[in-house]
Amino acid sequence: MMSHSPSMPCSALFLLLLLLLPPTFKGGSLRYHGPGWKLFHRLSKGFRSSHQRQTQQMRQNVPQGQSGDDCQGIFDLYLVLDKSGSVADNWIHIYSFAEGLVKKFTNPNLRISIITYSTEAEVILPLTSDSKEINKSLLVLKNIVPQGLTHMQKGLRKANEQIRKSTLGGRIVNSVIIALTDGLLLLKPYLDTMEEAKKARRMGAIVYTVGVFMYSKQQLVNIAGDPDRCFGVDEGFSALEGVVDPLTSKSCTEILSVQPTYVCAKDFYQVNISGHGLNNTSNMKQVICRFKFSDSKVVDESPSDMNEHSITCPGPKIKHTGEDVSLQVSLNNGISFIGNKLIITSTNCWSPRASQGIVFKRTWLMFLPVLLVTLLLLCCTWKLCIKPKKLPPPPPKPEKEPEEESPPPSSPPAPGRGPGPGPSAGPGPGPGPSPGSGPARSPVPARPPPAPLPANTNPTVIVACCGCGNRGMQGNLDTCCDYFHPSCHPMPLVWCHPKAQGGYPGFAVMKPSCSQASCRQKHCLCSNRDCFHLAEPPYPTRIVFQPNEKYFSITQSHYSPKIRFQTNQESLPVAQTLCSKMCSPPNQECYTFKSPQSPYQARYTKSPARMLPLLPPHTRQSLESLCHTYPFPPISKGPKF
């Protein structure tokens, strides 16, 4: 026989997978109208918008020289361009560079200002978000003729004036300055430029520098304040277009998404802000996460971690369910903020049986089918690879169960008491009628015969006797007078089992209580189990005892002598020295004592039980005189049962 290790059926896993796939991949199938049903409805929208923004972030975060995506950030952009005489005929490349940057910043809320400088500075386009004004200024820029000295500090001064004006007007946004130069700055202009750059950074602006042709790398780094915000073009003016994408990626400061967008009311949480250009700050201490509640309450939190693309901030508790909180981020210690009003909504995550709320995310469900498929494959692989275990064959059933040995049959009931005293030995169905009483009671119905014992079983018979001398176990018995002596108390006669088949049966006398009477002869027992013969007188004698009467009669006939007394239904062989048949009046069962000269074939009787005959004194005297009177054994006609 073979058996496999217990495992979950593959069909059950496959059925579970089929049941869970439709609600996972079908957007409109996730319907729940319990306390938090709005949570799942908003999660679907939040997941789609977050996925789109993360895709844009991946497109913008590309190495230098590769095409990036447009910038969707909201801030103020200032382009400060060099139009000094050293540019000469390469102005067209500077114009193409400016035009490429303007086209990369496509957010309609982004404001742009274009400034040119040489000996003096000029504002071509004041700070505006109007696309028509931006296009007109580009046409004006294209027709400019370069001339004059390189005084970058005057161009930065024009930018700082607009930043200051914008801040006083109540618009708090981030400012980005991109300054281009084509040569080395003299000492005085360089020092003045350094001072204007510091003023811009103090107002929250981020300064990027681009050098082309004969520029000083160290001057540009000092003006920008950070080596990462400095770009150099060594291949000439024509290579300016190659730095548009990396410069856009670096200068584009924007917030792409915030997670989670739904939080549990009255619970602490953390927000992860994803974006671009988030490292455009000199120190993490200048970064602020500002939470604005609907009741004009403002809570500022410092970030616990940040890098170029993400900021992690702890969030304040939201007391009311369904309340919206806007989030903004400042990279310059609160001077300006970036973010297009990111919204965080509180939901009821509490249940009667839960101590803490749980924020459910739809993205978790995306991994459930993968997990089920993995379990299904593992289950099938296990069933195919595992070797079946061979179990030992069951033991063969026995052809025939051994028969249980039946207990020996119960002892027969003792005969009724005669006129004389005599205790009964052994159990019986009921006491016999007492002398002098009315008619005898009806006999108790006989029990069904017990199961037959094996053929070689020899039972034990107990016969009343007294201590009449020495009795051997191999068949030596006294005469009838010894068994039924008047002076002896009734004792049981015991039929003992022979040690081997075919041996002589033995008699055991129980507790002899009287002295031995004078007996004249001994008789030997033969192995016949049916009956035993006594020396029969020349003429037959019939002796009948009535248990409840005090008389008996002896009649001579041609039949063998018979002795009647009350006993049970089983035949009981008695010693061969007896010369009579003993029968009980109620059931007429006889015990025949057969002489050795009997022509009848010996038969086995039923398994004899115990017999405890108790004879009155008159009966014992009659049997004793009978044995002395008739020494010759008669021939019995046959056994009777």
UniProtKB/Swiss-Prot annotation:
Record carries keyword Transmembrane helix: yes
Presence of keyword Translocase: no
Topological region Cytoplasmic: 385-641
Binding site for a divalent metal cation: 84, 86, 150
InterPro entries: Anthrax_toxin_rcpt_extracel, VWF_A, vWFA_dom_sf
GO (cellular component) term, any one: membrane
Residue segments, region Disordered: 391-455
Membrane topology listed for this record: Single-pass type I membrane protein
Alphabetically ordered keywords of this record: Membrane, Metal-binding, Signal, Transmembrane, Transmembrane helix
Gene Ontology molecular functions: metal ion binding; signaling receptor activity
Transmembrane portions of the chain: 364-384
Protein name in UniProt: Anthrax toxin receptor-like
